[in-house]
Amino acid sequence: MDTKLLDILACPICKGPLKLSADKTELISKGAGLAYPIRDGIPVMLESEARTLTTDERLDK
């Protein structure tokens, strides 16, 4: 995924910023507490496809 997209993409639920996960397989929304998958370089920004962040992930800076 092109990291330049992070400057223009926002969480569709809370409209907050997104952060690329360390392994570059998900976009993380701390505001919504969700992780959106990246498949074949394309972020899947659907709430139904996102996973809920764990408590540790929510607290991790």
Curated annotation (Swiss-Prot):
One of its GO terms (cellular component) is cytosol. Signal peptide: none annotated. It holds the Pfam family Trm112p. SUPFAM superfamilies: Trm112p-like (SSF158997). InterPro entries: Trm112-like. It comes from the Bacteria. Belongs to the UPF0434 family. This is UPF0434 protein PFLU_3771.
